[in-house]
Regions:
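Active-site acidic/histidine proton-transfer and metal-coordination neighborhood
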Residues: 16, 20-21, 25-26, 30-114, ...
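Histidine-acidic metal/acid-base catalytic patches
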Residues: 109-113, 123-242
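Active-site beta-loop-alpha junctions enriched in small/polar residues
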Residues: 1-2, 24-29, 60-62, 90-94, ...
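Conserved, mostly hydrophobic/aromatic
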Residues: 47, 87, 118, 147, ...
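N-terminal pre-domain/capping segments
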Residues: 1-42, 223-242
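Generic structural signal for well-ordered alpha-helices
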Residues: 7-11, 40-45, 70-77, 100-107, ...
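Short, glycine/charged-enriched secondary-structure capping and boundary segments
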Residues: 11-14, 37, 69-72, 101-104, ...
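Hydrophobic residues within beta-strands of alpha/beta enzymes
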Residues: 1, 55-57, 115, 147, ...
Length: 242
């Protein structure tokens, strides 16, 4: 939070419990570019003061020009270098990185970009499982420093239940993508890779008709995804060390 007392309270709790954390920025949505830039700058500096492992940022807007979004990325990179806190930019609808084909030119021009990869958004935007955008996918994998692990489809950013056999193809593909991100992190000798199982609440999670009851239990599915990723990690390490 921007409020100093609230921020101090949270930071003290994190210190007392010896917790690392990933900070989240999503608030900046101003249409006016100058106001947007100023607010983004303020939020990033505010989060960096808390010394998180990294800041996951919803950066830019899908309707800004390439040059405007590039200016925001350059500013964030300057803040990262100044503070020593990594800033990752989430692949998210409505932001500069809303689609695979529009994110690729930024990755090609700016090698310093770190991504929070959530390809479920890209699948939904492209109305495909991105089988025809392998260049963008492979490039994004190499830039991934943080993973939001949600299983999406060509029609929705979140399948109703990734445990459902009807969603097996989607689950297998996302596990492969996440595995490739982990392999790249190992190959480039990263200190760590952070992952958040992100099966979201409503409106990501659908309600049963005429109720306020979610069709699936959010905690159960995120725990399922966590276990799937852990199993995949073990397999990757065994394969690399065999």
């Amino acid at each position: 939070p921007i409020n100093l007392l609230q921020k101090k309270k949270i930071c003290c709790l994190l210190k007392d419990f010896e917790l690392d954390f990933v900070a989240q920025h999503w608030e900046t949505k101003e249409v006016n570019f100058t106001k947007h830039q100023d607010n983004l700058k303020r939020h990033l500096y505010n989060l960096a003061e808390a010394k998180p492992l990294l800041i996951n940022s919803h950066t830019g807007m899908d309707f800004y020009s390439y040059a405007q979004n590039a200016k925001l990325l350059e500013m964030a990179h300057s803040i990262e270098e100044e503070t020593g806190v990594a800033i990752t930019h989430e692949t998210h609808r409505s932001r500069f990185s809303f689609a695979a084909h529009t994110c690729l030119p930024y990755l090609e021009e700016y090698p310093f970009i770190k991504l929070t990869s959530d390809f479920s958004h890209w699948c939904c935007v492209a109305e495909s499982m991105l089988e025809n955008q392998t260049i963008a996918i492979q490039k994004a994998i190499k830039h991934t420093y943080h993973i939001h692990a949600r299983v999406g489809s060509a029609q929705t950013p979140q399948v109703i239940d990734p445990r459902d056999e009807n969603n097996k193809n989607e689950l297998d593909l996302f596990l492969k993508w996440w595995g490739d991100m982990l392999k790249n992190a190992i190959a480039t000798e990263r200190e760590y890779m952070t992952i958040v199982p992100e099966y979201g609440p409503h409106p990501y999670s659908l309600y049963y008709p005429n109720t306020k009851s979610p069709m699936r239990n959010q905690w159960e599915i995120n725990n399922f995804v966590r276990k799937e990723i852990l199993g995949h990690c073990c397999y990757i390490y065994q394969t690399l060390n065999s």
